[in-house]
């Protein structure tokens, strides 16, 4: 099992979670973060540090997010992130929007 970053992170990219991760398993794209499922130790330390509740435990309904994370890291060159950065501009405006992955990531690729 692993933890996954979900749709809530898109266009917000708060990075509070990355500094508490004991194994540095977060990776960064232009609009969101992902957790490398091969590196995550399932400790859950990052969950309470996400201000928008974007980090969830792996479950059957979230398996597509695990696969997306692997794809972004392996095939799109997303880089490891270990230090907190400022959230994306306008993050507060986007934090409650739904279906952001399809609107901003799928549309862009």
From Swiss-Prot:
One Pfam family from the record: Fer4
Details of cofactor binding: Binds 1 [4Fe-4S] cluster. Binds 1 [3Fe-4S] cluster.
Alphabetical keyword list: 3Fe-4S, 4Fe-4S, Electron transport, Iron, Iron-sulfur, Metal-binding, Repeat, Transport
Sequence positions that bind [4Fe-4S] cluster: 21, 40, 43, 46
Coiled-coil ranges from the UniProt annotation: none
Cofactor(s) recorded in Swiss-Prot or TrEMBL: [4Fe-4S] cluster; [3Fe-4S] cluster
Origin: domain of life: Bacteria
A GO MF label: electron transfer activity
Domain 4Fe-4S ferredoxin-type: 2-30, 31-60
Entry binding sites for [3Fe-4S] cluster: 9, 17, 50
Function of the molecule: Ferredoxins are iron-sulfur proteins that transfer electrons in a wide variety of metabolic reactions.
Protein name: Ferredoxin
Gene name for this UniProt entry: fdxA
